[in-house]
Structure formats: C-alpha cells, structure tokens
Amino acid sequence: LATASDGALALISGRSMVELDALAKPYRFPLAGVHGAERRDINGKTHIVHLPDAIARDISVQLHTVIAQYPGAELEAKGMAFALHYRQAPQHEDALMTLAQRITQIWPQMALQQGKCVVEIKPKGTSKGEAITAFMQEAPFIGRTPVFLGDDLTDESGFAVVNRLGGMSVKIGTGATQASWRLAGVPDVWSWLEMITTALQQKRENNRSDDYESFSRSI
C-alpha cells in the first residue's frame, strides 16, 4: 500500500516510535508516536516534544508512589508522557482518573487523554489530530485526501481533522464516534486495505500504459 501510494502511508499511535518500528519491521514508515508527541517524517527527520527532566522525574515519582495503592493497575512511562492502565483492575478507573487530574493541576503544561481502559498524561497540545495536520503539510502527503482508521477514543481528534480536510475517517468496531465510516473489526480492515492496494496498483499500471502509448504515438 505504501508503494502504491508513493510512500504516503503513516502509522499514528499512542505507542512509542520504537514500538511502532518493531511492529512494522522490516518496513520503515513515517510515524507519529505517543499521540503525536514524537513524529518522524518521510525523510527520517524526527520531531519530538520534550518534557524537562525534572518535571518528568517528579511526575514519575508521584505516579509510582500512588499507583502502588491500586493492585492490578499499571504505569507505563513513555519519557514525555505517562499511561495509567486499568484493564486488569477496572474498579480503579475513578481513582486513576482523579490521580491523573491532580497531576495536570500541578503541572498545567500536561493534559489528559482517555483511551480504552487507560488514561494518559501527555504534553498539552499533542494529539493524533495534530500529527495528521503536520503530515498533511509535508511531502508525500501534501495535496492528497487523508484516510485515517482508528479504534480508540484517542483517535477521535484524528477523525475530526480528517473530516475537516474532506478526507475519509473510519472507526473500527463499536462505540460513538465522529468518524464518517465504520468497519466491524480487524478482518474487515485487512480486506478493505487489500482492495484499496489492488485499486491503486491497477491505477499505476494503467498510467504507465497510457504514458507508453502517448510516447509511442509521438515517435
């Protein structure tokens, strides 16, 4: 799909870029990790939102101290962001939300981002929507119609941006959304992407054929 679209394919996730590269190996795509707090463009240049070491350390200490009171909850430190997971301890959702809100009150440069069984604390102004906006201002994405697929609450900011740009926003699975389209699950996503890839490849082949015929007529 990346080849058929001349490289205009990016992975945008709450995961770190290191994790995304490991998942996509051996391929190397433009990426936006940690909800846009870190991004790599088509040329390999990285764009990172840095959190001062002292602030990152103080937040980490507070979170580690408090989360120990909630068995089953997990803290994931991402450098400039922190994720409080409660999939294995849903009874602690309210307590962890309160904890995250307290952190953002102490450090107003941080913001909350809710997801599926997780609440994240990230630098204010970062989102998947902002990452899409940045990509759409750069080659090879500029001038194209964006298509964005996602299955989480954190993807809603991306859907909003894509809708505003006149693109195609696709929600995977159930749940309220501002996406314009919906696919039931991962198997449907694979089928849809394969269909798009085939269509793009055929278009490229047709263009080559047209170019060859035009050249032949000119000699």
Predicted regions and their residues:
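Short, conserved charged micro-motifs
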Residues: I55, Q91-L96
